[in-house]
């Protein structure tokens, strides 16, 4: 599973824009990695930030070796998807303008949890009844509430594991590419605070 940060298009010859965007991308990708590692240890295989063809970009690659049908796995993926934006907001106090695809993925994951896994009760189980306007309205409210809840959970995990975030971001700023061994070494140097979903 990949999480990527692709900011709005701009002229990549504009070094002022590049110097502004790269720190945000670093913390965005570090946020994905921190939350994933706290919730599912040894789940991140690679983090990269750098120049794409026309813009700065970043990628965090996660192993997909978890039981993908479990609610814990689904909730941890939802929280991890939101962690890039949560990290950027906490570090810079701004909304993450490059997280659109992460937000879309988060809403898709939350909808699946609500419809198929009944995390908010059986009344929104999607396979039993048709999709009336009342059903769709109720589902929209519950899905939005779940995304908000897991966004707050991502922020909590990042706040409690700030040392790991800062060390990971510093290493990423220096090297631009961190492999599994690099991530493990940094993590082993930090006090990791587990957080329940």
Which sequence ranges carry the predicted segments?
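Soluble catalytic regions of large protease machineries
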Residues: 7-27, 33-197
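Conserved AAA+ ATPase small/helical "lid" subdomain
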Residues: 1-2
